[in-house]
């Protein structure tokens, strides 16, 4: 019992084979698209995939369906992996529209930087007239790209509602800042003077170096925000289309 065995999460191709294996014993509708299914799911373990498929089977049986369809799979993935509520909370149209615009901003910037990278996106309405959401990126992106993507939601809302500061973006901004610091530490994106000193595991820095690094990070944050706005302007029709689709679905 003194040995440690490292187990890696399934890859996309692994996940598709695992899902196919578990679905062999279940009745499945032709509407289930295996490629779309593997793109929308996060797969940390085989057990997690099996649980999702079993929950989808239970949902289909409860609705007295002849087999599992894509709607069952999407509903279970939303609930199990992204915390969606079973019953849709009542949220105002304005909140839904801003939430949809925010998530569409992330999605459009992500697709502009890395085509085909978004596997799933949805709104997550919640109590107290709030609406969050997410995009699931199924391809690897660099720290610099992640920073621009994180700022896409804020950029989209502030481009549409000129003069307003987008609400609920603190986590996105924190994510962007951390990505900028990681890129500076690992890739030297802010010059060699900040290389290997700006990650979460950094040792204590001198006061002058800390001031210099913070100034560089803030400047990079502004530059990436400008890039996000530029990408959204170049893809205005796509942004409108995605926003409308999210508003229509609401979840």
Pin down the residues of each PLM region.
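Residue-level signature of catalytic and energy-coupling elements of molecular machines
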Residues: 1, 15, 45, 56, ...
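Conserved C-terminal "switch" segment of AAA+ ATPases
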Residues: 7-72, 153-158, 186-196
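Signal for well-folded cores of large energy- and translation-related assemblies
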Residues: 20-23, 42, 54-57, 61, ...
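Conserved C-terminal helix/linker of AAA+ ATPases
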Residues: 60-84, 117-125, 191-201
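Conserved catalytic-core segments of large NTP-driven translation/proteostasis enzymes
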Residues: 66, 70-111
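Soluble catalytic regions of large protease machineries
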Residues: 95-100, 107-251
